[in-house]
Each structure stands twice: as C-alpha cells, then as structure tokens.
C-alpha cells in the first residue's frame, strides 16, 4: 500500500456513486485494513464516474476537512478525475508514482520507464496518482472503519453519459490477471490473434494483451493494449509473442515476475528483459506449445 511512509495520511477513503451502489462499496471499503474512515457521497450524477461532478466534491472535502493529500489509482478513471481535481485545488499533480519516500516526496518513472524521477511537491495539497502494480494490495478483510455520509449538495452536470458499452469476456481482466499472453504485429491479422494467441491464453487461463503496433494495425482491440499509453501490467507470467519490444511496450510490462518471449529475431529488444526466450517462428512454436500444455 502507498500509505507506507505517510503515517495517517491515507486513512480516509472516498466513495462516490449512485445510492444503489455506493453504500455497498463503502461497506466493503470499511473492511480494508488500514482505513479508519470511509466518506460516502451519493448522487445519480456520480454513477458514470465523470470528472465534472466528482472533482468539485473532492475539492469541497479537502477544503472543509483540511486534508493534505489526494490519492487515486493511475487508472482510466483516476487519469480523468484527478487532473481536474488538481486544478480545482491549485495543485500540481504527481502522476503514476511507484514509491513513496515521504509525505511530500515520490518516485515516478519517466522516459517510458527508462529512468526514475524523485519528485518533491511543495503544494499545500499533494495530488497523486499511483501505479497499482508497484505496491502490495492491502487486505480486503480485517478492517473496521467507520462510514460517514457526506452531503453531495448541488452537483454540477455540464456533461452526461450518453452510452456505455461493456465488453464481455470469459478471460481474466488484463489489468489484474496473474497471467498474460500478448501478441504483436507479427500476428499479421485479427485472425492470427484468434488462431494463435487466444488458444494459448485459454490453456494458461490468461488474459490477452497486445502491443500498440498490433492495436494500431487493427489486429486487437484498444482495450488490450499493453504499454506506456495502454495498460501497465505486472503479472506472475507474461508471454510476449511476436513482439519486438519497443521501449513503450516494455514500460507497460517489464515489472512482470516472469517474462517469456517468442520471436524469430534473436536481436529483438524483448529478449533483453525476458527471463526465458525462444528464437522461433511463432506460427510453428505457439501451436506446439499450446498442444503440450
């Protein structure tokens, strides 16, 4: 948990959402070890998790309760809401931290993960997003935090959610999966992903990922992109198939516990970070590997 080194700073959790969901989430959050209080605010305007209604709520809570830190995951939702909250609080955001050195000092990757910057914030309110894979998860059981309801007041709604389409998959979620099989542009088509990557992923009970090159070529959905501008993953096992290993891709998966690379180019950069590498034609090696599993 990023609370290490910050004493009592991270003991409060904010849950904002519709009344039908927020209270159940607040109850679950109250059981997380290390949380002393859960603040829950309900409004139908919060249900879509849009930045416009939620950022002013964060601003109001910080100012009324004199909080010194605002912390959120460096997720799609966090990257949307927290920059707006930082502007409301007249603070400079520190993004994607991987280490907490003190109440005002954080470490974050730069240059696609090729260097680490130690950043000290001099703002009165520190606004931070956290790379979840860099910290051990807090236990979801054993806590006994109190729950306090917060009046949402008049909620601004300059935008509204028109449509939400959820993707359906029987595979694990890419961001949290313990095993990931990713394919690159060498698959040559979406049919290549379906024929070679998906069966291997299913045998390993793994999530499917893709390089940016494969996504840009239309071989895989954007939601499957792993890398600096996609999802940051750190599974127990990461299998890279036909991925050369551009620094932007490595930035999204190099913290994986075990990395296996399959590529016909022995000079591919992916082999520099791989724990195990196979120089082979993926069209021959992957079906054979899948069959033997």
Could you say what each language-model-derived stretch is?
Residues 1-10:
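Single conserved hydrophobic/aromatic residue that forms the stacking wall/gate
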Residues 11-18, 39-40, 207-211, 260-263:
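Short internal beta-strands
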Residues 28-50:
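A glycine-rich helix N-cap at a beta->alpha junction
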Residues 46-60, 110-114, 217-253:
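Glycine-rich, anion-gripping cofactor-binding loops and their flanking helix/strand elements
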Residues 47-135:
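N-terminal glycine-rich phosphate/adenylate-binding segment common to multiple enzyme folds
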Residues 110-172:
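Phosphate/diphosphate-binding glycine-rich loops and adjacent basic-rich segments that engage nucleotide
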Residues 166-228:
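Glycine-rich phosphate/diphosphate-binding loops and the adjacent beta-loop-alpha structural elements
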Residues 237, 243-293:
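C-terminal functional extensions of proteins
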């Amino acid at each position: 948990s990023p609370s290490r080194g910050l004493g009592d700073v991270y003991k409060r959790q904010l849950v904002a959402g519709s009344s039908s969901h927020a209270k159940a989430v607040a109850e679950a959050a109250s059981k997380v070890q290390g949380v002393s209080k859960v603040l829950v605010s309900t409004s139908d305007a919060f249900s879509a998790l849009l930045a416009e209604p939620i950022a002013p709520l964060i601003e109001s809570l910080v100012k009324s309760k004199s909080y010194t830190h605002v912390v959120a995951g460096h997720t799609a939702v966090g990257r949307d809401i927290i920059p707006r909250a930082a502007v409301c609080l007249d603070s400079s955001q520190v993004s994607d931290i991987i280490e907490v050195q003190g109440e005002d000092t954080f470490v974050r990757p730069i240059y696609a993960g090729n260097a680490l910057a130690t950043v000290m914030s001099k703002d009165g309110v520190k606004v931070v997003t956290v790379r979840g894979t860099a910290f051990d998860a807090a236990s979801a059981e054993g806590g006994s935090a109190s729950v306090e309801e917060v009046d949402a007041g008049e909620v601004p709604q300059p935008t509204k959610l028109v449509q939400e389409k959820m993707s359906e998959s029987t595979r694990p979620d890419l961001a949290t999966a313990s095993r990931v099989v990713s394919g690159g542009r060498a698959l040559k088509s979406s049919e290549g992903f379906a024929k070679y990557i998906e069966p291997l992923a299913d045998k390993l009970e793994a999530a499917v990922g893709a390089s940016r090159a494969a996504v840009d070529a239309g071989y895989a959905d954007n939601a499957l992109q792993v890398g600096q501008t996609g999802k940051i993953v750190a599974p127990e096992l990461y299998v890279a198939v036909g991925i050369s290993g551009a620094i932007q891709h490595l930035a999204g998966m190099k913290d994986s516990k075990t990395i296996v690379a399959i590529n016909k180019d022995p000079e591919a950069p992916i082999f520099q970070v791989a724990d195990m590498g196979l120089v082979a034609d993926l069209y021959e090696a992957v079906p054979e590997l899948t069959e033997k599993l």
